[in-house]
């Protein structure tokens, strides 16, 4: 997968290229990331990249010409086949479903805003989609871009050691993940659930699914609004509720 990033702080993306899962993906040639800094497209000695907004008000906007030229350079490198995404609090909220949609793209260009944002005409003429990682304000689009890159790259074939790791993640099936345990079998008097030590794969699968359903009900019940439960899921959830009520 090829990713282009337009950013005033390309150094920040070493967190993607040099570390962890994404770093290994880059090293193995499964993920390619290039950056374009609008400062490199300025024409004044101060390398100015901000400008005053029409109508006044506090703050500055990213200057149109350097930003637009940087986006154009990224498009040329992508062969004009890439989808251009602007990271914005006004965009579509990123969910696992959205991540799966974006992961189908072979090439993405991510535009990271700074200051008070970017000129609306840039969004109208250069941007294909706007995406947000949540209803809160950050200093720029770099952290949202890295969040998007990390989540999308996990779905690129070969990036994870086992594709099942991605399939079992929270939200991959619309539910929260089940609890996980490793050694030792007993920690501060709390034992690993016996079913996980049983070796019975079907019982383990059912337990994990039931825990996933129950945890979602307790912590994020609104997620069920978009789910159509199977007969098995309905039965397991009912058992979870009955057990929880009996233990009260």
From Swiss-Prot:
Domain of life: Bacteria
Annotated InterPro entries: Alpha/beta_knot_MTases, tRNA_m1G_MeTrfase_C_sf, tRNA_m1G_MeTrfase_TrmD, tRNA_m1G_MTases_N, tRNA_MeTrfase_TRMD/TRM10
A single cellular component GO annotation: cytosol
Enzyme class: transferase
Gene Ontology biological-process annotations: tRNA N1-guanine methylation
GO molecular function terms attached to this record: tRNA (guanine(37)-N1)-methyltransferase activity
Residues binding S-adenosyl-L-methionine, per UniProt: 113, 133-138
Catalytic activity: guanosine(37) in tRNA + S-adenosyl-L-methionine = N(1)-methylguanosine(37) in tRNA + S-adenosyl-L-homocysteine + H(+)
Compartments it resides in: Cytoplasm
UniProtKB keywords: Cytoplasm, Methyltransferase, S-adenosyl-L-methionine, Transferase, tRNA processing
EC number annotated for this UniProt entry: 2.1.1.228
Family the entry assigns: Belongs to the RNA methyltransferase TrmD family.
NCBIfam families noted in UniProt: PRK00026.1, trmD
Function, as annotated: Specifically methylates guanosine-37 in various tRNAs.
Record note on quaternary structure: Homodimer.
Name recorded for this polypeptide: tRNA (guanine-N(1)-)-methyltransferase
Protein source organism: Shewanella loihica (strain ATCC BAA-1088 / PV-4)
């Amino acid at each position: 997968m090829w990713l282009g990033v337009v950013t005033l702080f390309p150094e920040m993306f070493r967190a993607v290229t040099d570390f962890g899962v994404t770093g290994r993906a880059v090293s193995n040639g499964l993920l390619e990331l290039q950056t374009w800094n609008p400062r490199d497209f300025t024409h004044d000695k101060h390398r100015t990249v901000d400008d005053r907004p029409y109508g006044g008000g506090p703050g500055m906007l990213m200057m149109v010409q350097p930003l637009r030229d940087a986006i154009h350079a990224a498009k040329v490198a992508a062969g004009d086949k890439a989808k251009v995404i602007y990271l914005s609090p006004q965009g579509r909220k990123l969910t696992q479903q959205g991540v799966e949609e974006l992961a189908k793209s072979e090439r993405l260009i991510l535009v990271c805003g700074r200051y008070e944002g970017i000129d609306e005409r840039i969004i109208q003429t250069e941007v294909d989609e706007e995406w947000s990682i949540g209803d809160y304000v950050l200093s720029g689009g770099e952290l949202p871009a890295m969040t998007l890159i990390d989540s999308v790259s996990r779905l690129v074939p070969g990036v994870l050691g086992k594709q099942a790791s991605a399939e079992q993640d929270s939200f991959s099936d619309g539910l929260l993940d089940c609890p996980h345990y490793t050694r030792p079998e007993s920690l501060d008097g709390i034992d690993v659930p016996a079913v996980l030590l049983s070796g019975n794969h079907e019982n383990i699968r059912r337990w994990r699914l039931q825990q996933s359903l129950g945890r979602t009900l307790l912590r994020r019940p609104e997620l069920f609004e978009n789910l159509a439960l199977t007969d098995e899921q309905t039965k397991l959830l009912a058992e979870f509720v009955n057990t929880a009520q009996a233990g009260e």
